[in-house]
């Protein structure tokens, strides 16, 4: 494949998404950011982790019907038709994250879509942080391990007109094997969408790890 050797990449920062915000309103915000990126001649645009909804792992949800609303059974191509029309016209590639339900198995997923308006790559988050059960001492939760299964696609790379792309999601960035596996496959550009709270309450059981980090 003929690569574009130099191009502009953009990080599309959505900001907070309210639990009451519908997916259509979020996609409208994504479109506005994409227009801004286009004005700066960006060819690769990276949206955050789980960017179609609020970051629902913060909440303890016991009603399965309410939880199901956050998931997609496939990449929401019809919901994002205006976005895909623009990237098709401008020959762009975007990545974005969403909660995927694959035949009953939930994943924290990120995908690439190019100017063909088709998925050209998919990754499922491997290093899930947080906890599985409700912890009442926390003002908010971090329940990724409850709501998602560990990714089962490895760290693939994708041959595109912008080079060999690879991706990871949020906590994956903290583990050296993420970069090693991608690099050994010839990855040239890695994209990382993440969704990190401003404050995460202390976990006393991790104090010894914090002390270790402080002495590195």
Regions found by a protein language model. Give the residues of each.
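A short, flexible beta-alpha/helix-coil linker loop
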Residues: 14-19, 52, 196-200
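A short, N-terminal amphipathic alpha-helix
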Residues: 29-44, 78-89
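Beta-strand-turn-beta hairpins that frame and shape the catalytic cleft
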Residues: 1-9, 157-166, 189
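Active-site beta-strand/loop signature of hydrolases that rely on acidic residues for catalysis
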Residues: 9, 36-64, 94-95, 172, ...
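CN hydrolase (nitrilase-like) catalytic-core segments centered on the catalytic cysteine
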Residues: 72-93, 164, 170-216
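Catalytic-core segment of enzymes that process non-peptidic bonds
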Residues: 69-167
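Generic N-terminal amphipathic, Lys/Arg-enriched alpha-helix
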Residues: 4-20
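Short glycine/proline- and charge-enriched loop/turn segments
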Residues: 61-69, 136-142, 200, 205
């Amino acid at each position: 494949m003929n690569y574009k050797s130099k191009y502009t990449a953009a990080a599309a920062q959505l900001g907070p998404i309210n639990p009451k915000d519908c997916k259509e309103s979020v996609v409208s915000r994504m479109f506005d950011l994409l227009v801004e990126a286009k004005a700066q001649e960006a060819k690769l645009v990276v949206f955050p982790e789980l960017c179609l909804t609020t970051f629902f792992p913060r909440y303890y949800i016991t009603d399965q019907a309410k939880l199901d609303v956050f998931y997609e059974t496939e990449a929401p191509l019809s919901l994002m038709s205006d976005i895909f029309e623009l990237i098709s016209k401008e020959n762009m590639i975007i990545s974005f994250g969403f909660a995927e339900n694959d035949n009953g198995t939930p994943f924290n997923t990120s995908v690439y879509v190019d100017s063909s308006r088709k998925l050209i790559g998919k990754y499922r988050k491997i290093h899930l942080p947080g906890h599985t059960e409700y912890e009442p001492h926390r003002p908010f939760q971090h329940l990724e391990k409850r709501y998602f299964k560990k990714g089962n696609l490895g760290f693939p790379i994708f041959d595109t007109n912008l080079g060999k792309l690879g991706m990871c999601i949020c906590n994956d960035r903290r583990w050296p094997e993420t970069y090693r596996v991608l690099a050994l496959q010839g990855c040239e550009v890695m994209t990382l969408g993440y969704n990190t709270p401003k404050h995460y309450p202390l976990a006393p059981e991790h104090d010894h790890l914090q002390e270790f980090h402080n002495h590195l």
